[in-house]
């Protein structure tokens, strides 16, 4: 026989009721802070930027009388190929707390990009290897791939200690003044020949992994 596909039919007397019934199954989303409904500005696809660049972007919006509520720091707030280590590139951002405080004083919410893939150049790589915080191969070795960064490992959020470890990095950013987190990726997850800490089915984890990442960032 070929592959199977499961369907879930969720009904209701109206579209509103269908949505209520659907979220009964998936969970009810929390209402985001009001600021997040405003205009966002991102450094996405800007591969080299520093504090001066960020300030020029924000000043440019003000000069054009375009109201701005959120500013997002994409990949390169960290050093290239050290994703994710939760460490600012101090060559480009010498004093991150002071910068964040200055930007917040302008009424901006501040967002940083992260992902659960740990580069071999990241300071977190050796820690995760030693403590068993990464998804593993069936032989017990750490699963590594070159799909995003050379030899990267993937955080195993089914391990409670690994989840706490990753969440500590998120908390560090928030305590510094970051008010939102972009939890990127999570979709490039191996669906066979890997082992999770809690024995989860890798095939099913393909869809559940991103929820685990999001939940961890809320810890």
Question: What residue ranges belong to the model's regions?
Answer:
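Carbohydrate-recognition beta-sandwich/jelly-roll modules
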Residues: 1-69, 100-102
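Aromatic- and carboxylate-enriched substrate-binding clefts and catalytic-loop regions
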Residues: 67-217
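Short intrinsically disordered, low-complexity coil segments enriched in acidic
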Residues: 1-5, 214-219
């Amino acid at each position: 026989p070929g592959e199977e596909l499961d369907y879930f039919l969720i009904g209701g007397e109206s579209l509103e009721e269908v949505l209520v019934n659907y979220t009964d199954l998936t969970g009810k989303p929390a209402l985001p802070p009001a600021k997040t409904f405003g205009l966002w500005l991102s450094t996405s696809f800007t591969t080299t930027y520093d504090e001066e660049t960020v300030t020029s972007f924000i000043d440019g919006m003000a000069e054009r009388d375009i109201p701005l509520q959120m500013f997002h720091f994409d990949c390169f707030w960290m050093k290239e190929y050290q994703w994710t280590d939760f460490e600012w590139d101090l060559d480009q951002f010498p004093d991150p707390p002071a910068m964040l405080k200055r930007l917040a004083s302008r009424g901006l919410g501040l967002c940083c990009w992260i992902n659960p893939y740990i580069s071999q150049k990241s300071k977190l790589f050796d820690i995760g290897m030693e403590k068993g915080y990464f998804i593993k191969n069936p032989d017990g070795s750490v699963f590594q791939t070159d799909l995003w960064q050379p030899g990267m490992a993937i955080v195993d959020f089914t391990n409670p200690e690994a989840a706490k470890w990753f969440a500590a990095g998120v908390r560090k950013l928030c305590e510094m003044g970051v008010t939102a987190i972009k939890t990127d990726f999570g979709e490039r997850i191996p669906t066979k020949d890997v082992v999770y800490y809690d024995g989860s089915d890798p095939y099913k984890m393909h869809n559940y992994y991103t929820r685990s990442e999001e939940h961890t960032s809320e810890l």
